[in-house]
């Protein structure tokens, strides 16, 4: 079981993420804005799912803050498909970048892969 932090401003997607990942036995904490991600929450998380386009603080700024606190895998889940966004996300420390819409099975597989890499 992993502790997964999901940060996205879309409540329907948050519900989908929580349901799918809890079904796999993970504990899932949801935040709808990057500014609500605290240091203690970052330290709790074994894996972080992060949107890019959010009000208040975008996902890139949130990723930079998180990366200064923890080395837990960060996976972007975003509608931003342009090459510059992908390169920016990976360049600032994200471990993976999935574009919306995504398949839940693929998300589950990527979370599992990053979790097993971290345990090595």
Name these PLM-found stretches.
Residues 1-12, 17-21, 48:
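Conserved acidic segment of CheY-like receiver
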Residues 14, 55, 82, 100:
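The feature encodes the CheY-like receiver
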Residues 30-47:
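Acidic, metal-coordinating helix/loop segments flanking the phosphotransfer/catalytic sites
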Residues 32-33, 58-61:
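Acidic catalytic/metal-coordinating carboxylates
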Residues 41-44, 65-72, 92:
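Conserved phosphotransfer cores of two-component systems
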Residues 51, 78:
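Active-site residues of response regulator receiver
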Residues 84, 98, 102-115:
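C-terminal output helix
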């Amino acid at each position: 079981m992993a502790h997964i932090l999901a940060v996205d401003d879309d409540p329907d997607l948050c519900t989908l993420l929580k349901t799918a990942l809890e079904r796999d036995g993970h504990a899932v904490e949801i935040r709808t804005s990057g500014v609500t991600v605290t240091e203690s929450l970052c330290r709790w998380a074994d894996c972080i799912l992060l949107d890019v386009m959010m009000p208040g603080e975008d996902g890139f700024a949130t990723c930079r803050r998180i990366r200064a606190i923890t080395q837990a895998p960060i996976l972007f889940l975003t509608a931003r498909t342009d090459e510059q966004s992908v390169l920016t996300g990976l360049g600032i420390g994200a471990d993976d970048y999935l574009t919306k819409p995504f398949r839940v099975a693929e998300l589950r597989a990527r979370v599992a892969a990053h979790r097993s890499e971290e345990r090595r």
